[in-house]
UniProtKB/Swiss-Prot annotation:
Pathway: Purine metabolism; IMP biosynthesis via de novo pathway; 5-amino-1-(5-phospho-D-ribosyl)imidazole from N(2)-formyl-N(1)-(5-phospho-D-ribosyl)glycinamide: step 2/2. PANTHER family: TRIFUNCTIONAL PURINE BIOSYNTHETIC PROTEIN ADENOSINE-3, TRIFUNCTIONAL PURINE BIOSYNTHETIC PROTEIN ADENOSINE-3-RELATED. Its EC number is 6.3.3.1. CDD domains: PurM. It comes from Lactobacillus helveticus (strain DPC 4571). HAMAP family: AIRS. InterPro entries: PurM-like_C_dom, PurM-like_C_sf, PurM-like_N, PurM-like_N_sf, PurM_cligase. This is Phosphoribosylformylglycinamidine cyclo-ligase. Pfam families: AIRS, AIRS_C.
Length: 349
């Protein structure tokens, strides 16, 4: 008799999970990593990177109630990409190169096959961002979570030379705002999405509204959050940018002003980029005002680069070389007394 297992915690299932994820973890290895899976801590040799005045930059995040969509659909192998993306894009926004990542999974019942799929997604996100997955924790808590549910969070650490950190002081009047498209909703606003679609309108994740061009609601919503590291890190290292805004919870309204001082104002042209069908669909179904959408969703722009005028052509050319789409969406100007830090012109396409 195993009293611990009877109480709801299966240690053997934990060992099974570790075996299943070893190959995925190994695929994220970097030359700076050391130690083995199962050690008490993950290790990373900073000296090999050759930074002169290194500053570590850390970020942590989860996936929010997007997890509920994944679990309802039984699609667990992409939600880990979202978790990594939410963390590494934040680290990138400070001007840092993501180095390593740790994940935390909490569940009511350790299903090794299911959770291995989750970690597979985490590993894929790490590969896309150049991060080593150096550790993690799986907590089986039968009285805390329902049997078939899990929660996921992650922790990213990056590095930059102190003088290369992107701060608000770098942004200047006349800087051009270049927006990089999102892959969709990303990982924010899902409580509102679920309220509008599933509670107010009683829709199902398997429904295929005509407005979504034949794709199911669940399929669209589960599109992984885009990771921007490969496209943007080289621009940071070449000192071509004055700032980066990761457009997450709070949308453009809350996140873009975080990149510049109070004496500046962002002027954003709403017609400068196409808005994906899912945002129009949500706006119509929820009868949401444009301002509410801008304050909740990314509305098609996942990352905004603050670019000095003199660097705009070079930045655009390098983005083209990376096959990264971009839109010139506005500029920074002096903030008139009494006005907000961000204003919008026109309307969405």
């Amino acid at each position: 008799m195993n009293r611990y297992k009877d109480a709801g915690v299966d240690v053997e299932a934990g060992y099974d999970l570790v075996k299943r994820i070893k190959k995925d973890i190994a695929a994220t290895s970097r030359p700076e990593t050391s130690g083995t899976i199962g050690s008490f801590g993950g290790m990373f040799d900073l000296e090999k990177l050759g930074y002169q005045h290194p500053v570590l930059v850390s970020g942590t995040d989860g996936v929010g109630t997007k997890l509920m969509i994944a679990q309802e659909m039984g699609i667990n192998d992409t939600i880990g990409i979202d978790c990594v993306a939410m963390c590494v894009n934040d680290v990138l926004a400070q001007g840092a190169e993501p180095l390593f990542f740790l994940d935390y999974i909490a569940t009511g019942h350790n299903d090794p096959a299911k959770l291995a799929q989750v970690v597979h997604g985490v590993a894929e996100g790490c590969r896309q961002s150049g991060s080593a997955l150096i550790g993690g924790e799986t907590a089986e808590m039968p009285d805390m979570y329902p049997k078939n549910e899990y929660d996921l969070a992650g922790f990213s650490t990056g590095i930059a030379n102190k003088e290369d950190i992107l701060t608000q002081d770098l942004a200047k009047e006349g800087d051009i705002l270049i927006g990089l498209p999102s892959s969709g909703v990303h990982s924010n606003g899902f409580s509102l999405i679920r309220q509008v679609l599933f509670k107010d309108h009683h829709l199902k994740v398997t429904d295929r509204p005509e407005a979504l061009e034949g794709k199911s609601i669940g399929e669209i919503l589960l599109t992984p959050t885009k990771i921007y590291v490969q496209a943007v890190l080289s621009l940071v290292k070449r000192h071509l940018l004055h700032g980066i805004a990761h457009i997450t919870g709070g949308g453009l309204i809350e996140n873009l002003p975080r990149t510049y001082n109070d004496d500046l104002q962002a002027e954003v042209n709403l017609g400068a980029w196409p808005v994906q069908a899912i945002f129009r669909y949500l706006q119509n179904k929820g009868q949401l005002k444009e301002q509410d959408c801008l304050n909740t969703f990314n509305m098609g722009i996942g990352l905004v680069l603050l670019v000095p005028k003199a660097n705009v052509l070079q930045v655009k050319e390098q983005l083209k070389q990376k096959n990264e789409q971009y839109y010139e969406i506005g500029k920074l100007r002096k903030r008139p007394i009494g006005e907000k830090k961000i204003v919008f012109n026109g309307s969405f396409k």
